[in-house]
């Protein structure tokens, strides 16, 4: 009997006097043919298939198809990818644990073994999304924000502690430690994973999926991973492989070096703009070229982090000597570093100078051409040269819907006993935030050095600026202190406010009341400048209409200038003690100064801060939970509720039902994000969710955020399509979650309309433009519509994660025929929709969609089914991926 490829490829290697078994790609190549020029990212996938070959979920034909990708730099085949581990943050992690607990209830009700609902691979949940910038600008800010976080989220944290003891291989990194992606980069990521199997140590690539779209940051360490929805991550941790098509791989060649004064942030904004224009949705991006020789790992991680912003599944940097240097710096053991080097060299995954893999398509960037940039005011891919920011702000200001804003007159206000004028274009938030940049010592040291020069010249921030510093790990505080830069940042208001995502995810906290009142009184267009990765409208703060992504030193600079109308390339940023003008170039640190400061970063800092990473504060340790297999649901809880998704589930799936007489709940434009569909930020008192919380006795000050309430479906379904900036074309000129209920045409909230339709037994549809569901890997952007009764979404195109999430929740994603849009069809939202033949649905094939207009005329469209794989079709036929997993457990 001939050996399988898996068995035939077994080999051993030596590292640090230890023997490791592994599945050798060179041995497999004796059967598969030459794979030396396969992109490194696909070699990781190939090893994954080889190691998991079982003749069922992974066959020799699957392995042959991936190796054969080289022939056309493309392959049309579905494969089953099994990541080594799962990463979560608390906004997505809490609902995931709610789902797991609800699955145990369903398995128990259907007569199965609840012990089967347990992770089969390691799961790390980092609590980083809950801290809010309530206090800022003084030494007490950090302590006060931590205290408030623990008070507000006590119930959620009790639940997560229950999950930690109830589920195996499930670890929680407590609040106040850092941001999940930076903790992953600095500590959790191994580059090469290993485990004891049958008394042998087995080595294989470190791979993962995460419940946050920026999981891709770890690609900078040569670890293949990307963001998925919570439901897909839950299935993965329970042993279900991730179904995917073999991806196209776009090669991005980097050459040269960054010019003096140019930062990694400027580079990533340029890369994002180029790749978004190229079109990389659903594709891998792999970086290569001699520019990598001098590109620090922190810069690579910054670029990899923004893969969701350029639309790619991942932004992969192969492992090389730069990777090993970073692993040593961040405190990984010499045994681990030696294993990574030996393994990747043996497998042909090591990057050598001059490597030119085969790619589907390529781009090239000479890093010497990158210029100082921001991105904004509403999308991360809209890069603006520093010198053009005032023009970009003015252009966006003119587009504001309220014509009464034309005057843009300053508004007088009083703050702390002093009178000021708040001008149009004021920078009211300046935040050094997000792991994208706070994982990068060079840009943080640059911010500190710029602050030092500014303070020494007597410059001060403008009084309306809310400044904050929220690093992604405690190591940042250590090296800023070691470089003696912390006092200067404090002097300019950039005091430590927390170790977490804060402003970048909308946890910017309230502005001082006089400033909020002035913005409302003058209907002013104000700005936020942040070192983050997302600037979608309504995300950072409800009153801030323009949001700009910038490097940390530019964040400090804009706090000093205080206005988006100031041209920092040519105008003074302020005046010194002698009233002489000071320009940005006068306080911008040189690359030599930055390099000297970065030398202060030491391995001891990483080892000290990560020695007790799972321990937490005294408040965390004091949280006590009772051990049990199933959760004790509390009827009066407004944070944690038993989700209803499995209430009516049977052991066998029912046949698919056609959709008849569906009404359109919302008709939306292009680039509708998951933030629009399911916001994470503040809850308005007069919204359906706000009214629900008040009816349950929750005071307005205790609303917390939508993100923190994701364990309660009652809040989340009411918050679906509730973003204050969403524009439903069925109600022109109206912003917010409103729609027309048909046929009576009453204008009411989307939630109230959906409930009326449910009472009438009417299925619902959503119509949209291009890039529907871009942004965060937010499974509530699919769960919420499902609970509202949405059966189908018809769009011009979908972003990858959201399309998958829709299928995972039993919602059908369809694409309009090429060249056909809601506008070319003249849709008003009054149409009714019929979709028949769903029992004969095929991946990627066309589906007839019948439109019946208000006047009775009809039209049939052949829409493309965006269920892309046979496995996804199976999930859809089971009413969702978790229903499928439960039924497998019952077999």
Predicted regions and their residues:
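Terminal amphipathic helices with adjacent charged low-complexity linkers/tails
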Residues: 82, 100-156, 286-287, 292-402, ...
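Acidic, glycine-rich flexible loop/linker segments
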Residues: 576-591, 803-875
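Long, structured ligand/cofactor-binding scaffold of large enzymes
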Residues: 54-257, 264-269, 372-375, 394-494, ...
């Amino acid at each position: 009997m001939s050996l399988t490829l898996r068995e035939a490829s077994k080999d051993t290697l030596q590292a640090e006097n230890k023997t490791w078994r592994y599945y050798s790609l060179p041995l497999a190549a004796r059967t598969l043919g030459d794979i030396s020029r396969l992109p490194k990212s696909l070699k990781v996938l190939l090893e994954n298939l080889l190691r998991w070959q079982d003749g069922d979920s992974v066959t020799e034909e699957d392995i042959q198809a991936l190796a054969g990708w080289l022939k056309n730099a493309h392959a049309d085949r579905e494969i089953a990818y099994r990541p080594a581990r799962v990463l979560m943050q608390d906004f997505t992690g809490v609902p995931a644990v709610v789902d797991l607990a609800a699955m145990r209830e369903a398995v128990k009700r259907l007569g199965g073994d609840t012990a089967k609902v347990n992770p089969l691979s390691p799961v790390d949940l980092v609590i980083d999304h809950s801290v809010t910038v309530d206090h800022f600008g003084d030494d007490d800010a950090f302590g006060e924000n931590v205290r408030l976080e623990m008070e507000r989220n006590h119930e959620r944290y009790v639940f997560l502690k229950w999950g930690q003891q109830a589920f195996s291989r499930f670890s929680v990194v407590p609040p106040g430690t850092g941001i999940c992606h930076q903790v992953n980069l600095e500590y959790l990521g191994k580059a090469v994973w290993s485990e004891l199997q049958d008394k042998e140590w087995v080595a294989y690539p470190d791979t993962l999926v995460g419940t946050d779209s920026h999981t891709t940051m770890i690609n900078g360490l040569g670890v293949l991973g990307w963001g998925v929805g919570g439901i897909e991550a839950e299935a993965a941790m329970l042993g279900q492989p991730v179904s995917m098509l073999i991806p196209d791989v776009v090669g991005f060649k980097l050459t040269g070096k960054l010019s003096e004064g140019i930062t990694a942030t400027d580079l990533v904004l340029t890369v994002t703009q180029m790749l978004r224009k190229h079109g990389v949705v659903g594709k891998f991006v792999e970086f290569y070229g001699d520019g990598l020789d001098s590109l620090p790992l922190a810069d690579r991680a910054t670029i990899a982090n923004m893969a969701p912003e350029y639309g790619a599944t991942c932004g992969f940097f192969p492992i090389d000597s730069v990777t090993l240097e970073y692993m040593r710096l961040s405190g990984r053991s010499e045994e681990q570093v030696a294993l990574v080097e030996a393994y990747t060299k043996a497998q042909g995954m090591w990057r050598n100078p001059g490597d030119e893999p085969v790619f589907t398509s390529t781009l090239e960037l000479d890093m010497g051409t990158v210029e100082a940039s921001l991105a904004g005011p509403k999308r991360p891919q809209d890069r603006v040269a520093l010198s053009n920011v005032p023009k970009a702000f003015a252009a966006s200001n003119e587009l504001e819907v309220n014509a009464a804003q034309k005057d843009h007159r300053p508004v007088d206000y009083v703050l702390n006993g002093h009178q000021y004028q708040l001008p149009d274009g004021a920078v009211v938030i300046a935040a050094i935030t997000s792991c994208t940049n706070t994982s990068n010592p060079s840009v943080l040291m640059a911010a500190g050095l710029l602050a030092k020069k500014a303070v020494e010249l007597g410059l001060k921030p403008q009084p309306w600026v809310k400044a904050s510093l929220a690093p992604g790990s405690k190591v940042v505080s250590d090296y800023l202190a070691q470089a003696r830069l912390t006092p200067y940042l404090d002097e300019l208001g950039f005091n430590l406010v927390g170790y977490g995502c804060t402003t970048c995810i909308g946890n910017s906290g309230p502005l001082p009341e006089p400033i909020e009142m002035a913005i409302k009184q003058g209907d002013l267009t104000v700005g936020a400048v942040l070192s983050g990765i997302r600037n979608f409208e309504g995300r950072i703060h409800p009153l801030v209409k323009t949001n700009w992504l910038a490097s940390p030193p530019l964040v400090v600079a804009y706090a000093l200038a205080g206005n988006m109308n100031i041209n920092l390339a040519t105008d003074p940023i302020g005046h010194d003690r002698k009233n002489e003008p000071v320009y940005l170039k006068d306080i911008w640190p040189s690359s030599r100064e930055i390099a000297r400061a970065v030398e202060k970063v030491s391995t001891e800092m990483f080892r000290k801060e990560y020695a007790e990473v799972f321990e937490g504060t005294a408040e965390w340790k004091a949280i006590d939970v009772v051990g049990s297999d199933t959760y004790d649901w509390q009827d009066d809880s407004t944070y944690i509720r038993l989700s209803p998704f499995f209430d009516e589930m049977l052991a066998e799936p029912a046949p698919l039902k056609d959709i008849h007489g569906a009404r359109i709940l919302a008709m939306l434009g292009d680039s509708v994000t998951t933030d629009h569909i399911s916001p994470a930020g503040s809850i308005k008192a007069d919204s359906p969710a706000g009214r629900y919380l008040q009816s349950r006795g929750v005071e307005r000050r205790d609303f917390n955020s939508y993100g923190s309430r994701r364990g309660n479906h009652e809040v989340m379904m009411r918050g679906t399509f509730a973003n204050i900036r969403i524009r439903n074309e069925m109600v022109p000129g109206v912003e917010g979650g409103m729609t027309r209920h048909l046929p009576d045409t009453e204008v009411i909230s989307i939630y109230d309309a959906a409930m009326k339709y449910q009472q009438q037994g009417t299925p619902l549809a959503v119509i949209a433009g291009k890039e529907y569901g871009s942004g965060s890997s937010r499974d509530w952007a699919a769960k919420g519509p499902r609970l509202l009764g949405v059966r189908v979404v018809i769009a011009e195109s979908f972003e990858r994660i959201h399309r998958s999430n829709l299928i995972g929740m039993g919602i059908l994603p369809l694409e309009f025929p090429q060249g056909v849009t809601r506008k070319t069809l003249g849709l008003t939202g009054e149409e009714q929709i019929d979709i028949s033949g769903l029992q004969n649905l095929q991946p990627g094939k066309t589906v007839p969609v019948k439109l019946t207009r208000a006047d009775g005329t009809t039209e049939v469209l052949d829409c493309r089914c965006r269920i892309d794989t046979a496995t996804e079709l199976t999930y859809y036929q089971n009413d969702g991926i978790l229903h499928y997993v439960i039924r497998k457990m019952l077999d």
